Amino acid sequence: MPRLSPPIETGLLWTLLALPGAFMTYRYVQGTTFYGEYLHATGELGARLLIVTMAVTPLRMMFGNAAWTRWLLGRRRYLGVAAFGYALLHAAAYLQRQSFAVIVEDAGELALATGWVALLVMLALAATSNDISVRQLGRRWKWLHRTVYLAAVLTFAHWILTAFDPLPGAVHLAVLAALEAIRVWKAAGLNREVRSS
């Protein structure tokens, strides 16, 4: 089976990542989807894409240099930017719905503040998810992109604190924590092998 050229493959991937958001937004604008449903759906999809983005390294450690893990690694930036895009739709719906006074008042509450800080961190990550930023920032780029862990903790804190039922958010957080535990465990094993060799 012939492989797609990189531009076509990238375009198809972006289309697949954007389609759910376009469909949800269309239904929301048409009034078919209610505000609460749209807010939940965009936030949940953004959080799930964030998990997939962060799962790439643990999966490579678990399954090695398989073709599908290499494919994921090469598209990790796209997944991260898409996660930010859905977080932005989530925030835009809230801003469109609430008055300025309510927005200012809510921003001081932990449940909402965690979401805003997570969005700002994800904005910085999305804005620097390109080769130009990698070259310009040098070692600082890797340091900056480690703040994805902060964004993840804040994202799931926001989900758990604002949800009527915190269990789904807690389950997603547990999945991410398990993947990160595997990453740390595998990395520690590799370090021991290096020291003993």
Predicted features by range, described:
Residues 1-197:
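Membrane-embedded alpha-helical bundles that constitute the cytochrome b-like, heme-associated redox core
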